[in-house]
């Protein structure tokens, strides 16, 4: 049974994720004129570039919507963002700079909460502005059907009639103007931006060329720290966690997680913290490029990971990071609520995050340049006296203990030496010239 409709279902209720921009405004009016009963749904995700959320539903009504709703998704979005930090659900990084999966997190929330609102209104057909080449078309498809198993999908941008009549921005602007809406296209930027409270994504157009970089981007959550005329002063910040939850910034306790995140964004944004340039694999395995902002996510992530390394042992940290990489990829693919993702997430929250209580003090400078100044926690397993270079009373172990430990290593050293001789005898290894060490063939320039 197909769930994707290739043509407009006239006479039926059709829900559209409405942003108020040119594309969704033209699509809504066009669908109304072609005979659909249009219902508009707008997600308040705390977008930093949106000044008046209440105006968007009113605009939808003016374009012909029977009903228009503004759905406040901010609390749920922050909840999912904190869960991602707790579980380290980030798999894309370049040179130590991390992409915090802010768009996938936003889609998980939007795709479930808007479809749930539609279901309340008896709307079982959903359309949005995602294109067939991107990730969002699959993310929204999965989250929508998870929320409403009876959902049908209608996307104007997959409808050939819509494309033929309103195939570009100029045609859509002319269409709105012809129907009395006096819609003026905004000036074309050199790239496209999508944002929510957790972060912003800049991509496409000029940014598709790798010779264009961060310098053409105008940050919406931070400052252009790469410019000499951008004044950025060092700032000391204290972040406090209690049982994995961020609860205070600079001594100010927050009961509202949204307010805490807004303050974290403001603090990190003053420095351009969390801004990065990534090449990534989309769900369909083609590579894309994006420049990302996530000042609050970056600030909380740095403090959280500092506590993780001071509290948990090496094997736990290794498992946390390996599972986080896997979970990040599932999140990116639109599988944040799949059973395998829930298993990884719940494990990290239960066995890693629950122990994360303490304060981390940082000095923020420009961009991702920062220093850790202090780490305090009642749960720290870091105890400097265990390894102090000074003489201490009641030492955890003695020289004799270390001699015994090293002696036990003779077993695997002997086994390894035997294996190396075997590899040498079979030609896999050879002796380095002038030294009694083993050397792989390609180390000497052997390309075979």
UniProtKB/Swiss-Prot annotation:
Chief location bin: cytoplasm
Keyword Lipoprotein among record annotations: no
Gene Ontology CC annotations of this record: cytoplasm
GO molecular function: argininosuccinate synthase activity; ATP binding; protein homodimerization activity
Chain residues that bind L-aspartate: 131, 135-136
SUPFAM superfamilies linked to this entry: Adenine nucleotide alpha hydrolases-like, Argininosuccinate synthetase, C-terminal domain
Residues reported in the UniProt entry to bind ATP: 17-25, 43, 129, 131, 136, 194
One GO term (biological process): urea cycle
Pathway in which this enzyme or protein is active: Amino-acid biosynthesis; L-arginine biosynthesis; L-arginine from L-ornithine and carbamoyl phosphate: step 2/3
EC number(s) recorded for this UniProt protein: 6.3.4.5
Key words of the record: Amino-acid biosynthesis, Arginine biosynthesis, ATP-binding, Cytoplasm, Ligase, Nucleotide-binding
Binding site for L-citrulline: 99, 135, 139, 192, 201, 203, 280
Location in or out of the cell: Cytoplasm
Family annotation (HAMAP family): Arg_succ_synth_type2
NCBIfam families (UniProt xref): argG, PRK05370.1
Family of this protein: Belongs to the argininosuccinate synthase family. Type 2 subfamily.
Subunit structure: Homotetramer.
Protein name, entry field: Argininosuccinate synthase
Organism: Bradyrhizobium sp. (strain ORS 278)
Gene from which the chain derives: argG
